[in-house]
Regions:
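Structural detector of well-ordered beta-strand residues that form the stable sheet scaffold
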Residues: 3-5, 55-56, 125-127
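Alpha/beta enzyme core
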Residues: 8-119, 134-143, 150, 218-221, ...
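Active-site proximal loops enriched in glycine and acidic residues that flank catalytic Cys/His/Asp
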Residues: 95, 128-130, 152-154
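Active-site clefts of carbohydrate-active enzymes
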Residues: 121-123
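C-terminal alpha-helical cap/extension of soluble enzyme domains
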Residues: 138-229
Length: 229
């Protein structure tokens, strides 16, 4: 299943109105608009594309009248109305983990999730799942969460493996001159001084992608184990 995430109602309009048969679902994001206008545009999009795709919508305004970022916990009443009047299949709810919040503000609100679940059932998408503890992740479906976003975890937790590989293969990736320079500057130690020549197998995008993909598969497997094992 291929999902088109954070498709902006205006900037991505051409894409949103194109042939999306290769996608299973799309997040139609009109959250920069006031609530009523958001619902109007989302409802119209559901009417045009709702028979072709599973559509995910965002019921919260992310900016106030002054253009300031808002990060309020989603209200169950508003969420129920949004789903009823737009016809979306899944609603993105801010449950304290939204990426717009600063790090010290991230705190998953299972109570808010369950209040929404009581109104719309298990049709909630959680963004910012990377900041949720493993114990909480195990219980997400009970809270009404049917879809999660974990891209930050995929990027963050796969990065160390790529960094380690690059450091250990500095000469093969960048050549012996760069390796020697980094040793002189103190960024690498003498044990890194292999003197190897750079090689195509190490400085291609494919080589780095293979490392990242391998690590990402492990991360996804970890999430699946939390839910199903």
């Amino acid at each position: 299943m291929i999902h088109l995430d954070h498709a902006q109602h205006d900037a991505d309009e051409e894409l949103l109105e194109s042939d999306l048969s290769m996608y299973s679902s799309v997040m139609y994001d009109a959250s920069v608009l006031p609530m009523e206008e958001n619902m109007e545009k989302t409802r119209a999009y559901v009417r045009r594309k709702g028979q072709e795709l599973l559509i995910e919508g965002v019921c919260d305004e992310i900016t106030d009248a002054d253009g300031e970022i808002r990060c309020e916990i989603t209200d169950a009443d508003k969420c129920e109305r949004y789903m009823r009047e737009t016809g979306v299949d899944i609603v993105v709810a801010n449950l304290g983990t939204e990426h717009r919040a600063s790090g010290h503000d991230l705190h998953y609100r299972c109570d808010a999730a369950r209040a929404i679940k009581a109104r719309i059932g298990s049709r909630i998408c959680l963004h910012g799942t990377s900041s949720v503890s493993n114990d909480q992740i195990k219980k997400l479906f009970d809270d009404g969460i049917c879809k999660v976003n974990i891209w930050t975890a995929l990027e963050r937790d796969s990065s160390p493996a790529l960094t380690e590989w690059t450091v250990k293969n500095a000469a093969k990736c960048g050549g012996p001159a760069l390796e020697h320079k980094l040793i002189e500057q103190g960024y690498l130690t003498e044990c890194s001084g292999t003197g190897n020549k750079s090689t195509l197998d190490y400085y291609t995008t494919t080589a780095r992608q293979e490392i990242i993909f391998r690590e990402m598969k492990k991360i996804v497997r970890g999430y699946l184990d939390l839910w199903y094992c």
